[in-house]
Amino acid sequence: MRELSPRTLARYTQIDYHRELALVATVWEPDPEHPGELREAIIGVARYLLYADGDSAEYALVIADAWQRRGLGMQLMTSLVNAAREQGLKVIEGLVLGNNAPMLALMSKLGFRVDVDAEDPSMRRVWLRLNPDRPEPAPMDLETGS
């Protein structure tokens, strides 16, 4: 994964904790600009952003190619789901490309339901009810949050 621009780094690290949460996985690696020194590199990010209703959120997960299929996505998403539950959220959801079998398998393993997106059949809406004792929510419009 390349180095993040200052603007992108600020976006990942300056968070409004009332509306969003970002979990970042990093490793120390050799710094090519300073031989013999190490630099911290982001290898994965899981985040959620609350919808206007305050009860549900959209998630995103990004793992550097070299770190995929090593359990990092599972660790980050498990922590993100647990944090969303602790925050009192009812539903967390996201969109996944229909041909992204590893991501769909991960979401299924975590208990997410997988539906074909009504607006784009090439996408899958994956969602998890965080309080299983409550009735299932109606499908959410990802653009308006309602």
Question: PLM ranges: what are they?
Answer:
Residues 1-146:
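Long, contiguous binding/interaction regions
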